[in-house]
Amino acid sequence: MLKDIRFSYDRGTSWALDGVSLTVHAGERLCLVGPNGSGKSTLARLIAGLTAPDGGEVTLLGQRVYAAGPNADAYRAARHGIGMVFQNPEDQLVTTVLEDDVAFGPENLGLERELIGERIVDSLQAVGLANLRQSDPTRMSGGQQQRASIAGMLAMNPAMLVLDEPTAMLDESARAEVMRILDDLQARGTTIVHVTHHPDETVHADRIVHMEAGRIIGITAAVDNRSPLAEAVSQSETEGSIGTEAAPSRPTNDSPRQREREDGSELPLLSDGIGDMTNPIIRVSHLTYRYPSAKRAVIDDLSFTIARGETVALMGVNGSGKSTLVRMLCALTAPTAGSIEVAGVPVASTGKRGRNVRPKSANRKQLAQLRRHVGYVMQHPEHQLFADTVAEDVAYGPRNQGLGETEVADRVRESLELLHIGHLADRSPFDLSGGQQRLAAIAGVLACNPDVLIMDEPTASLDAQAKKRIHELLRTLKSRGVTVLIITHDREEAEQIADRVVRMPIAAPASGGPVTATVTEPAVSSNGPAHSVIHRLDPRVKMVGFLAAMFTMFAVNTPTQLALGIAITLAVIAAARLNPLRVLESIHPILILLVLMGVVNLFVVRTGTPVVALGPLSITDQGVTIAVLYACRFALVIILGAVFLTTTTPTAMTDAFATLISPLNRLGIHAQEIALVMSLALRFIPTLTDETRAIVDAQSARGGSIETGSLAQRIKAMSAIIVPIFAGTLRHADNLSLALDARCYEEGIRRTHWRALTIAARDLIFAAAVIIYIAAIIAL
């Protein structure tokens, strides 16, 4: 129950919530709707106990958590019965094995190991992911990640589940799956509070709470989404200062052959990818893409054309390769096979070598030509903004095209006015709302005056008013002859704006068939690294053993010792069931650096017998020996470290490290928290790396010199990404802190561990082998 709640983000200058009173009944399904900025997400966090208000009274699950001030103990008790799922599932994942991630919350609650196993099985079955329990959730599709996040909450058996736009970035089938899960929870009596932009998601709600400008303006009963009230809800949000996205229509089998767009013209029935062959501006032929470590191709033998001036919608389920495809069209990702031609530029070509060979990528001159003709709006706008002001960011592309400052200013003004955001010109892009950031990112691409505009879900999470602006923009661009390829999950949107639709084929599932999970022990796959002896070692023994072996490498000073070190390293790789070439590929930048250091040593060492004289420089036999020894022993250290990281999950490392440094607790040092920070750092390094790559790609897509410029220009371009990377790090940290609170992690709590740490015979054998190896190195 909330009574007269007030909440401010700026110490009372403005109020995100102002005088809100609301009672949520046990077992009720409540939907929060309203324009962006109306306070829905803030109210959801207050209901979840993740944020305290600035005034009023809050009672959660019978606990009076806020009156004159926050009651920490009451908040702690209430949060044990409340789960929350956020819009971005990736920031809620704490480890790289699904079952370990689901176990994290129950471990924080201190549940017994056997009960944790049962909770994992039940929650994964409830969301349809029981057959992926050993998979890496960070590599799943968006829909699967969101279901994994829900499973993590269900494993805590919450009395109330709060969801903040959980389907905002999902396709129709994934959205339907999430709604099915909520229907099942509703039938079990779980209290559900659901923030949504989709009127059709409110159908099964008991009540709908309508919000505007931080206030509740009405509470209504749910009705069918095709009723006049649902239309009125959508219309009221459209007319607000910031509205919400309209619900997608669902054409039935008896839909007419043609559908009417907003402007009265008609859209052909959703079609295949064959366009007008007489004047194509985009030509894709037998395109295939496979991720480096994947067995199946995510895109397999795809061919289509797009005619000049055509507007085409690209549709498909989450994980079907839509974003990968448009990245290949923009020369930001290289295909595995096939050819691509965009605006007359051979982005990827096989020539006469045949279509099954890896295609030749565009050279620098061709890339520069491509950037002048093609604009790319990314899915996440925060990745595409990096300047100090919106105007400077929009000017980035035109300046890279070599335009004069007068023409650059004209381009900036025209682009901002076209999207009705001229008043934001002097604002920092990092201070804008998500919708404003998306419009600013689009303006930056439009300022480049592209002939081809590629947009990755430009209207996702936008309110109805901003969405309408995008549709008007697309019609304006079409009238100017601009070719548009737009990724969308919204069939109604495709019918309104597109000439036709290219459907992405559904990729083969990672694993198929029904699975009835009854196992309550940590799982291992039947083959590969996860089933290897090295993987199954107790992480404490493995951590100490690998560190000992790695430090021993620094004692290698003779060829015999080096040969023994190489033999041991190869044996470890074999025992880990890893491909040696894959291991070397993963660390090849470091290996290149070591080779360069070895070359330097060749000319620095003066002792020994000269074997080669190069003018004033000479290479001696001792110089060669030292160069090889130093480079190889450092390489062996790096390789062993790579094997350890590959075969040990962040959760296992956390548990092992926390146990090994637990004696520090007696000195008042929080060993468990130190271990968790280490684990989360390892978990989010790939995420931040991907975000850095996205910012670099955003610069490249607008002709940035980070891709094709001189060394000085590249260094200058690299410096421009520091601020957005720092902002992204803070954003991830803030989201992660909320996720940890939602999963009841607290400093100093007694956590149980689902993966029991026990010393087995294989651990003793491994420890003995390490000791023998160290003794042999010393003896030699």
From Swiss-Prot:
<keyword id="KW-0472">Membrane</keyword>
<keyword id="KW-1133">Transmembrane helix</keyword>
<feature type="binding site">
    <location>
        <begin position="34"/>
        <end position="41"/>
    </location>
    <ligand>
        <name>ATP 1</name>
    </ligand>
</feature>
<dbReference type="InterPro" id="IPR003593">
    <property type="entry name" value="AAA+_ATPase"/>
</dbReference>
<feature type="transmembrane region" description="Helical">
    <location>
        <begin position="623"/>
        <end position="645"/>
    </location>
</feature>
<feature type="transmembrane region" description="Helical">
    <location>
        <begin position="586"/>
        <end position="608"/>
    </location>
</feature>
<dbReference type="InterPro" id="IPR017871">
    <property type="entry name" value="ABC_transporter-like_CS"/>
</dbReference>
<feature type="transmembrane region" description="Helical">
    <location>
        <begin position="759"/>
        <end position="778"/>
    </location>
</feature>
<keyword id="KW-0547">Nucleotide-binding</keyword>
<keyword id="KW-0812">Transmembrane</keyword>
<dbReference type="GO" id="GO:0005524">
    <property type="term" value="F:ATP binding"/>
</dbReference>
<dbReference type="GO" id="GO:0016887">
    <property type="term" value="F:ATP hydrolysis activity"/>
</dbReference>
<keyword id="KW-1278">Translocase</keyword>
<protein>
    <recommendedName>
        <fullName>Putative ABC transporter ATP-binding protein BL0043</fullName>
        <ecNumber>7.-.-.-</ecNumber>
    </recommendedName>
</protein>
<dbReference type="InterPro" id="IPR027417">
    <property type="entry name" value="P-loop_NTPase"/>
</dbReference>
<comment type="function">
    <text>Probably part of an ABC transporter complex. Responsible for energy coupling to the transport system.</text>
</comment>
<dbReference type="Pfam" id="PF00005">
    <property type="entry name" value="ABC_tran"/>
</dbReference>
<keyword id="KW-0677">Repeat</keyword>
<dbReference type="InterPro" id="IPR003339">
    <property type="entry name" value="ABC/ECF_trnsptr_transmembrane"/>
</dbReference>
<feature type="domain" description="ABC transporter 1">
    <location>
        <begin position="2"/>
        <end position="238"/>
    </location>
</feature>
<comment type="similarity">
    <text>Belongs to the ABC transporter superfamily.</text>
</comment>
<dbReference type="Pfam" id="PF02361">
    <property type="entry name" value="CbiQ"/>
</dbReference>
<dbReference type="InterPro" id="IPR015856">
    <property type="entry name" value="ABC_transpr_CbiO/EcfA_su"/>
</dbReference>
<feature type="binding site">
    <location>
        <begin position="316"/>
        <end position="323"/>
    </location>
    <ligand>
        <name>ATP 2</name>
    </ligand>
</feature>
<feature type="domain" description="ABC transporter 2">
    <location>
        <begin position="282"/>
        <end position="531"/>
    </location>
</feature>
<dbReference type="GO" id="GO:0042626">
    <property type="term" value="F:ATPase-coupled transmembrane transporter activity"/>
</dbReference>
<keyword id="KW-0813">Transport</keyword>
<keyword id="KW-0067">ATP-binding</keyword>
<feature type="region of interest" description="Disordered">
    <location>
        <begin position="230"/>
        <end position="272"/>
    </location>
</feature>
<dbReference type="InterPro" id="IPR003439">
    <property type="entry name" value="ABC_transporter-like_ATP-bd"/>
</dbReference>
<feature type="transmembrane region" description="Helical">
    <location>
        <begin position="551"/>
        <end position="573"/>
    </location>
</feature>
<dbReference type="InterPro" id="IPR050095">
    <property type="entry name" value="ECF_ABC_transporter_ATP-bd"/>
</dbReference>
<keyword id="KW-1003">Cell membrane</keyword>
<dbReference type="GO" id="GO:0043190">
    <property type="term" value="C:ATP-binding cassette (ABC) transporter complex"/>
</dbReference>
